[in-house]
Amino acid sequence: MKIAIVGYGKMGHMIENIAKKRGNNVVLTCDPYAEDATFKSSDSEAIAKAIKESGAEGIIEFTHPDSVENNIKALLPLGIPLVVGTTGWLSKLEKVTALTKETNSNLFYAANYSIGVNLFYKIVAEASKLISDFDEYDCAIWEAHHNTKADSPSGTALKIADYVLENMKSKTELVNGNFPCKPEKHQLQIGSTRVGSVPGTHTVYYDSVADTIELTHTARSREGFAL
């Protein structure tokens, strides 16, 4: 398959390596800052034109929350299947969904493409369902990533929160960032840390007076996100 990669940072390079190992042909890499990118521009329309001329049969977008909406708008009309790995843009999801329908295009998005993280979602959902019957347990989420990650909390943490809120009846509201020092019982907190080169760690705490149950997923590298 001929693939174009939009966003040629650490994840873009990792995606290229894995794509080639699987017998795919990366025909274009787009990034205004990467010295080894084959097309250097941040202009979404110019990127779309370059991709069309490259003969790409699939597009993988892994850029920045500030760029992803314009990229999607420019790329969908090409009619080429688009996979989006960028997080931090879900406030625009309704607009993007409408555009996808208007252009009769294919767009696939997930907060995290790691097999382990998607298994973790199911574990959290089941644990939250079990613990929901025990009022003595409180719950909170904490996540840590490298100090260059653009969004906070992570898209993965927000997705984990969805599973907790769906399955733990005592939690009905999500709070993150500057949350109150004394949260209400119904509030689910997400705490975020940005430090060093951490690929990604997510922990869900179920805490009571008697004990604490911790569920943690720790990524060892970015490779799991690119598989």
Model-derived features: where do they sit?
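C-terminal substrate-binding/catalytic lobe of Rossmann-fold NAD(P)-dependent oxidoreductases
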Residues: 2-6, 10-50, 133-227
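Short, acidic/turn-prone active-site loops that include or flank metal/cofactor-
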Residues: 32-35, 86-90, 113
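Rossmann-fold NAD(P)-binding glycine/threonine-rich loop
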Residues: 77, 85-107, 118-127
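Rossmann-fold NAD(P) dinucleotide-binding segment
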Residues: 48-58, 62-85, 94-97
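A charged, well-structured terminal subsegment
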Residues: 122, 126-138
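A general structural signal for well-ordered alpha-helical segments in protein cores
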Residues: 12, 68, 93-96, 120, ...
